[in-house]
């Protein structure tokens, strides 16, 4: 009996060891699993200890970093105007960007003549380059925006061409060009001559015929050129001195109180006749200036010398002359188009009548 039960006891012992081993392995596995879970939990706890609102999700808004760039496409449209007008406008856009990188400008509203902040792309895209242009005035400080206003497209092109010519002159001067230096000297002399005070000198002894013909034509010429000028009236001996002192400050004004007329040698009749003639000369001058619609200031006196500082009325005819010419050309073009349309309609009608007649002939046949 005892011997037979021995194998069974041995088997029971091996099973017992197996069970203990299995239980121990399971405990180790459970402990290992628990420790891994706790390790990740503690790691997560450490990483999220400063976040009171919980973990950050992928759909949460990200902070804008300094290295990131956000760009907005700005499109300027050039649907009208000549190539020169487009070049001038593109140059203006480039210069505005130099002062204002975001293209914000102060625009002079032509309707109200007030400033309002605008984006340059709005102005450019709403400008008809066939008739209008833009002019920019640079700001006086970095805090200000450039000033932009509407002008005629011809003036914009001229301003652009003048700046290109000036830049070319500076480039030639920097390279030591002698020709450029001569051109600049000639232009400076012409500008000095143009800015010089224009004077028309008359003598008290001038005849009414010469005054109303020769001198009148000279006055009308200056008025047509819209030039400010001075009319000096005195004795023949004083005209040379007046011409030389016209550019000096108060040069002519200092001579108005003096006279070389020999009043003390005249009798009453001669004195009355001389004063009457001077009154007539001065009256004719006033009539002539009133006819030209000029403004003038009078200095001096009839018994000495007189000066009339003349300012012509602004001449708008020359400013509108080109516009009138363009309007006339446009009207002529419209008439030609209308005639061509009428001719085309007439030809079409004749062709239709010919076709109808041919068709009727075929039917009769």
Swiss-Prot record:
Residues 1-40 form a transit peptide. InterPro entries: AIM23 (IPR029427). Residues 55-71, 319-333 have a biased composition (Basic and acidic residues). Residues 38-71, 314-333 are annotated as: Disordered. It is found in: Mitochondrion. Pfam families: mIF3. One of its GO terms (cellular component) is mitochondrion. Keywords: Mitochondrion, Transit peptide. Belongs to the AIM23 family. This is Altered inheritance of mitochondria protein 23, mitochondrial. It comes from Clavispora lusitaniae (strain ATCC 42720). The lineage of its organism: Eukaryota, Fungi, Dikarya, Ascomycota, Saccharomycotina.
